[in-house]
Regions:
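Non-catalytic cap/lid and distal C-terminal segments of serine-dependent acyl enzymes
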Residues: 1-246
Length: 246
């Protein structure tokens, strides 16, 4: 399994342009952690290749974990691939044992783009008690394949069914940051799902953006905004460079 892990640097903050942080400061406490998921045709390295997520993570004192999921949508597939269990059970244990990250749900977040936005939604909705917020940018919600849609319906990988399940079980769903470019090919399905979530009473921050398609230019903006937006109660919350604006 291929991974990229970003841990804020206590020794050389100026290397990433965070000049106002003392070079000698020590780690105060475990870092809050974001599990950040890539899209179809991408891998664990694309977020760092095409966005400034390293700088944003440093500014926000946030650990970021990125894994490769091939093109398997972060779920369990019939051919034996089980990226769902890896992401939901195995990876968090490994990360907590290897890096100075928090174990508290209040300090744990999940987000992604396109296929990864779908992955963030199904993992966040299957385990709402584990996350303080969910982020989905240009989420690949819905499918044109009728057989696939029928097979997924009301199961653990159906975003609509998971919302209904949480409501029926009276589970509290964490706040959701939901963004999409208005010229994105997925706009209609994303907008429909947003309307469904709002109608169901979920706490949704909706960020439509005119002039953007399914593109890294948009996702670079949104990952910065998401990191500024997320609720924080950790030891670094007051010190982060927060330019909060949505």
């Amino acid at each position: 399994m291929e991974l990229t892990v970003i841990i804020p640097s206590p020794s050389i903050p100026e290397a990433l342009g965070v000049a106002d942080r003392p070079a000698s400061y020590e780690v105060q406490a475990p870092y809050p952690v974001l599990y950040l998921l890539h899209g179809l045709g991408n891998d664990h390295s694309d977020w760092t290749s095409y966005t400034n997520v390293e700088l944003f993570a440093e500014e926000q004192s946030m650990a970021v974990v990125m894994m490769s999921a091939e093109n398997k949508f972060y779920r369990k597939n019939g051919n034996g691939d089980d990226f769902y269990t890896f992401l939901s059970e195995e990876l968090p244990v490994f990360i907590r044992n290897m890096f100075p990250v928090s174990r508290r749900p209040e300090d744990t977040y999940i987000a992604g783009l396109s296929m990864g936005g779908y992955g963030a939604m199904i993992h966040g909705l299957n385990h709402p008690e584990r996350f303080a917020a969910i982020g989905a940018f240009s989420a690949a919600i819905g499918t044109e394949d009728e057989n696939e849609a029928e097979n997924l319906k009301d199961g653990p990988f159906d975003p609509y069914g998971l919302v209904r399940k949480n409501i029926a079980e009276e589970k509290k769903v964490p706040p959701i940051y939901f963004a999409c470019g208005m010229q994105d090919m997925l706009w209609e399905k994303v907008n429909d799902y947003k309307d469904f979530m709002v109608k169901c009473g979920l706490d949704v921050t909706w960020v439509p953006a005119d002039g953007f398609r399914h593109e890294w230019r948009f996702w670079n903006i949104q990952i910065e905004k998401f990191l500024e937006w997320i609720p924080r109660t950790d030891a670094y919350a007051k010190d982060r460079q927060n330019h909060r604006a949505v």
